[in-house]
């Protein structure tokens, strides 16, 4: 370029070998020369004041673009299923196209500004307006944002009866095919690749939308907006509209970054219950990434099987993290270990059911926690041993104890010990359960022998007591006989003395008859 004294700039070329192939164009504008008009638009229950900035000599542009936005933004919000996300003011400015093949519009999410060419069609306006949602903060990659901005823009245009021509992929554009996950950021340096990328990404978005359905896509966007990745723990169910791998599963794990091509595939399949691997293989991935999709498919099948088998139990977070990061070798190893632990759980459940014991929560807590599976395996072994101790004690419990067992159990409370063992097991105090079971087992196991010993002791004591009583009674009776004989002897002696006295008196009487009484008669 050459500039003369008047300020005129002249561009010249040298001799052209192929002058018919030569093409040049010039762009110029005055970015600060705008007339601003505020346009209030109701979007998702919120009133937006859109700043329309048109060139002073082109009021028709503001009228046309403002009319499209006033009608289109509410339709876009309803179709996408999200409210207006940008807290700031939306600025829509008239501009010129700065490329020969790119779109005649551009959206800058950093400042909330849309530039729309002075000649742009309603389709372009709606496409750029859709970028207010698909601006890199909802989805991470260019192809996804461009594709769904085109899809929803075209959908809104059709709903509003705008006549728009939807471009289809030409063979010339297809010749510049690149994997969409390798399509670089805008603005691209290769115009032909960009042309392919815009059209191909729109084709992919339409294919995805046809398979997912409006409600399925809305669920994906809601999850992406809230930072909710795929592979959520069980228990969320209908509240998140989730189906598929791990989605009928406690607390939402949020904080995920906007999904890239991998996270988007996971979210789509998780939220819609459909598969999209064929679309990804055809349009999105590099050839060397095809094996990664195969690994993913096998890992997801195993994941679904283990989640289904786990039931109400949640898989530990480390498994879900490995699946989200596409670390499928690590995820497969962890899932296999989890499956083995579920075998242990089944063994513990069967043993507890047989023993009529309520399972503690310790194994589940260890399984679902951040620790390694070794803690859960150790807990399973400990619970099995505790149940075995309980069953060993319960097996000795007599249905109807006889007198020998009853005597042997004097002072022992094995029934209470067994009940204590069951309660301690259910509360997770395995040591106390084993100790209580041991007390019950020892009491019942030794009751018969102890009862016999006690009865023999009682019998011996009884016999000794009877002998002592017999001896005492014999002695008493012997003493009574001796006393009786003595009393009889004394009575006999008294009788003899009495008889002797009587005989003596009689003898004296006979020796002195009354007629021979020497005393004078008058003194009688």
Question: What residue spans do the PLM features occupy?
Answer:
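Cytoplasmic C-terminal tails of single-pass
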Residues: 480-524
């Amino acid at each position: 370029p050459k500039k003369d004294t008047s300020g005129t700039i002249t561009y010249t070329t040298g001799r052209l070998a192929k002058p018919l192939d030569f093409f040049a164009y010039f762009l110029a504008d005055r970015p600060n020369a705008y007339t601003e008009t505020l346009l209030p638009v109701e979007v998702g229950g919120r009133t937006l004041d859109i700043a329309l900035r048109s060139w002073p000599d082109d009021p028709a542009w503001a009228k046309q673009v403002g009319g499209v936005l006033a009608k289109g933004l509410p339709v876009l919000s309803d179709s996408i299923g999200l409210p207006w996300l940008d807290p700031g003011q939306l600025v829509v400015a008239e501009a010129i196209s700065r490329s020969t093949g790119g779109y005649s519009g551009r959206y800058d999410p950093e400042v909330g500004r849309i530039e729309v060419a002075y000649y742009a069609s309603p389709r372009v306006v709606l496409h750029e307006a859709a970028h207010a949602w698909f601006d890199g903060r909802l989805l991470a990659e260019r192809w996804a944002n461009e594709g769904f901005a085109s899809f929803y823009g075209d959908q809104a245009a059709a709903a509003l009866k705008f006549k728009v021509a939807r471009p289809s992929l030409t063979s010339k554009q297809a010749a510049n095919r690149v994997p969409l996950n390798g399509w670089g950021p805008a603005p691209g340096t290769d115009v032909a690749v960009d042309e392919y990328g815009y059209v191909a990404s729109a084709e992919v978005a339409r294919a995805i939308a046809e398979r997912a359905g409006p409600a399925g896509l809305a669920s994906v966007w809601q999850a992406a907006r809230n930072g909710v990745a795929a592979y959520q723990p069980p228990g969320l169910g209908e509240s998140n509209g989730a189906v598929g791998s791990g989605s009928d599963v406690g607390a939402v794990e949020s904080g995920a970054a906007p999904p890239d091509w991998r996270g988007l595939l996971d979210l789509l399949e998780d939220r819609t219950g459909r598969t999209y691997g064929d679309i990804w293989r055809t349009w999105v991935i590099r050839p060397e990434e095809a094996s990664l999709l195969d690994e993913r498919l096998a890992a997801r099948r195993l994941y679904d099987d283990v989640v289904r088998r786990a039931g109400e139990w949640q898989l530990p977070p480390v498994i879900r993290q490995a699946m989200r990061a596409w670390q499928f070798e690590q995820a497969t190893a962890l899932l296999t270990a989890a499956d083995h632990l579920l075998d242990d759980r089944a063994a513990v459940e069967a043993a507890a059911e047989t023993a009529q014991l309520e399972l503690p929560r310790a194994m589940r807590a260890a399984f679902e926690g951040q620790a390694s599976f070794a803690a859960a395996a150790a807990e399973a072994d400990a619970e099995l041993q505790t149940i075995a101790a309980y069953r060993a004690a319960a097996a000795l419990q007599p249905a109807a104890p006889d007198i020998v067992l009853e005597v042997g159990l004097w002072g022992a409370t094995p029934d209470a010990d067994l009940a204590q063992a069951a309660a301690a097991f259910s509360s997770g105090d395995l040591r106390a359960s084993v100790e209580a079971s041991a007390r019950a087992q020892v009491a019942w196991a030794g009751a018969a022998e102890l009862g016999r010993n006690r009865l023999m002791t009682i019998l011996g004591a009884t016999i000794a007591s009877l002998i002592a009583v017999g001896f005492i009674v014999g002695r008493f009776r012997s003493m009574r006989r001796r006393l009786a004989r003595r009393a009889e002897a004394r009575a006999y002696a008294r009788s003899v003395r009495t008889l002797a006295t009587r005989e003596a008196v009689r003898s004296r009487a006979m020796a002195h008859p009354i007629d021979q009484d020497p005393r004078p008669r008058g003194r009688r």
